[in-house]
A protein has these predicted regions:
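Alpha-helix C-terminal capping segments
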Residues: 121-131, 145-157, 178-179, 276-286, ...
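Active-site-proximal loop->helix
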Residues: 143-206, 302-315, 423-431
Length: 455
C-alpha cells in the first residue's frame, strides 16, 4: 500500500486574508502609465472614469505589500478555495525524470479556471461603489465566464465582447456566460466606433484581445453608471491572483519541499504572477534562488521577441500608455486555440521583472503544447485548457533536463483551468489538423515599427 501523498489540501479556514502586492518589494518599480495626449504620468484618480475607484487605487499602489481581502469576497472564495496542490507522480513516471513535479489545480473553480479569483474582487468593488453595469473583453471565454458568475453573485449587469475566433471556436463558453445572464457580442462588432473602424479596414478580422478591450472600454465610457473590468495585464488583477501562490506556499510546506522552478503560462501576466509573486518575495527580500518561467505561445512572443517601451493596451488607443514588452498594439495574432494568450503586450510588473532579469520567458509552439497537454491528461487524468498546456510543456522541458542531468529539482506550475469546453481544439490536434504558427523577424520588426508614431 502506497503512503505517498498525492494531493495537499488546506482547510477553508486557511483561505488567505490578504493579497500580496509584489510592487512594494521590487527594487525597480514599474514606470508609471502615461496620458497619451500629454505624456504625463497618471494618478489613480485619472483612472476613476474607467475603473472602480478601489481598483484604480490598487493599480497605482506601489508601497503597501499586503491588501486586505474583503469579507464578502472571502465568503465567495469559500465556494471553491482552497484549491489543491497536486504531486504529478504519473507525469514524473512517464517522463522518467528525477524531478518532483507539482501543480496548483485552479480548474476546480465553479467556472473551471483561476479567473474567478479576480472576477469576484472586481465585481465586489464595483457593487460597493454603487455601479450597476460592467463591461469586459474575453479571449477564450474563461474570463468572461468568470465575470458573468461574479456579476450575478453581486447583482450587476454585464456586457462581454468575445474575440470573434473564440466566439466561433468555443460556443459553450459563450453559453456559460449567457446562462449567468451576460450579454455576449463577437468582437470586432458593428456596435462600437472602434469595432466599425476595424471591420471597415479589415472585413475578415478574426478579433484580438486588444480589439475587444477597445470595444468594452468604449461601451463603459458611453453607458451611465458603468465601469470597465478586465481579466489580466493590469496590476490589480495580478494582485487578486496572488491568492494562488499564497496557498501554494503553505501547501509546499505540507509537502516538505520548496520549488526550484515556478512556471505559468503567459498571456498578460495574471496567471503567471498569481503563482509566482508570493514566492518571489523571498527572492527579492531574502535572496532565495528560484527560477520563474513564463511560457508564452511562439505565435504571440511579446516577452521573447518583443520590445520594452510604452504602448497602448488596446488596438484603438483608448487606454493609457503602459510600459510593457510588446509586439505593437496593432498586432493581429494567429488563430491559435489558446485564445487567452493572444495578446500583444505584457503587464507592467512582469515587464519590469523581465527587464531586470528576475524572471525568464520561453516560447512554446502550438503542437508542443498539445503534445504536453495530452501527456498530462493521460498521466494525471485532467484534460488541461490549451493555455495551461503551455505551462505543462515548459515543465516537461525542464523535467527532461533533469533526466539528462540527474538533478531532482522541484518544479511547480499553475494549471489555470480545464479543457473540457475546448475539445474542438483537441479534436483538431488528434486529427492532425493543427499547425504551428511562427512569426518572421520582418513581421515583428514591421509591426513594432508602427509604434514610432506614439513617440
Amino acid at each position: 500500500m502506497s503512503t505517498k501523498t498525492k494531493r495537499f489540501i488546506l482547510p477553508e479556514s486557511e483561505i488567505p486574508t490578504r493579497w500580496y502586492n509584489v510592487m512594494a518589494d521590487m527594487p525597480n518599480k514599474p514606470m508609471p502609465p502615461l496620458n497619451p495626449a500629454t505624456k504625463q504620468p497618471l494618478k489613480a484618480s485619472d483612472l476613476y472614469p474607467i475603473f472602480a475607484e478601489a481598483l484604480a487605487d490598487q493599480e497605482m499602489n506601489q508601497t503597501d505589500p499586503w491588501i486586505d481581502i474583503p469579507d464578502e469576497v472571502r465568503e465567495q472564495y469559500k465556494n471553491y478555495r482552497c484549491t489543491p496542490l497536486v504531486r504529478a507522480y504519473g507525469l514524473e513516471k512517464a517522463l522518467g525524470t528525477p524531478a518532483h513535479i507539482y501543480f496548483k489545480n485552479e480548474s476546480v473553480s465553479p467556472v473551471g479556471s483561476h479567473k474567478l479569483n479576480s472576477a469576484l474582487a472586481q465585481a465586489y468593488y464595483c457593487k460597493r461603489q454603487g455601479v450597476t453595469n460592467i463591461t469586459t473583453e474575453t479571449g477564450a471565454g474563461q474570463w468572461g465566464a468568470a465575470l458573468s458568475y461574479a456579476a450575478k453573485a453581486f447583482g450587476l449587469e454585464l456586457a462581454v465582447y468575445m474575440v470573434k475566433i473564440s466566439y466561433e471556436q468555443k460556443p459553450y463558453r459563450r453559453s456559460i456566460m449567457q446562462t449567468f445572464g451576460a450579454q455576449v457580442t463577437a468582437s470586432p462588432s458593428m456596435s462600437t466606433k472602434a469595432g466599425r473602424k476595424i471591420l471597415t479596414e479589415h472585413p475578415n478580422h478574426q478579433g484580438s484581445l486588444g480589439t475587444a478591450i477597445s470595444e468594452a472600454i468604449e461601451l463603459a465610457m458611453s453607458t451611465p453608471n458603468c465601469k470597465y473590468t478586465l481579466g489580466s495585464v493590469l496590476s490589480h488583477v495580478t494582485l487578486h491572483q496572488t491568492i494562488i501562490g499564497l496557498e501554494a506556499e503553505k501547501q509546499m510546506e505540507m509537502a516538505g519541499e520548496y520549488p526550484d522552478l515556478i512556471i505559468g503560462c503567459f498571456g498578460g501576466g495574471s496567471n503567471f504572477g498569481g503563482i509566482s509573486f508570493p514566492f518571489m518575495r523571498h527572492t527579492l527580500k531574502e535572496g532565495r534562488k528560484t527560477r520563474y518561467i513564463a511560457a508564452e505561445p511562439d505565435s504571440c512572443p511579446k516577452l521573447t521577441r518583443g520590445v520594452f517601451r510604452y504602448d497602448f493596451g488596446d488596438e484603438a488607443g483608448y487606454t493609457p500608455l503602459l510600459p510593457m514588452f510588446t509586439l505593437g498594439h496593432n498586432f493581429a495574432p494567429a488563430n491559435i486555440h489558446a485564445g487567452g494568450l493572444r495578446y500583444h503586450g505584457a503587464g507592467v510588473i512582469v515587464s519590469q521583472l523581465l527587464k531586470d532579469k528576475l524572471m525568464e520567458a520561453v516560447d512554446i509552439p502550438q503542437l508542443e503544447s498539445f503534445d504536453a497537454g495530452c501527456l498530462f491528461a493521460q498521466t494525471e487524468g485532467i484534460i488541461p485548457a490549451p493555455e495551461s498546456c503551455h505551462a505543462i510543456a515548459a515543465a516537461v522541458r525542464e523535467a527532461r533536463k533533469c533526466t539528462e542531468s540527474g538533478e531532482p529539482k522541484v518544479i511547480l506550475f499553475n494549471l489555470w483551468g480545464h479543457g473540457l469546453i475546448d475539445m474542438a481544439a483537441y479534436d483538431k490536434y488528434l486529427a492532425g489538423d493543427l499547425v504551428n504558427y511562427s512569426l518572421s523577424d520582418e513581421q515583428i520588426k514591421r509591426n513594432i515599427g508602427e509604434l514610432d508614431a506614439i513617440g
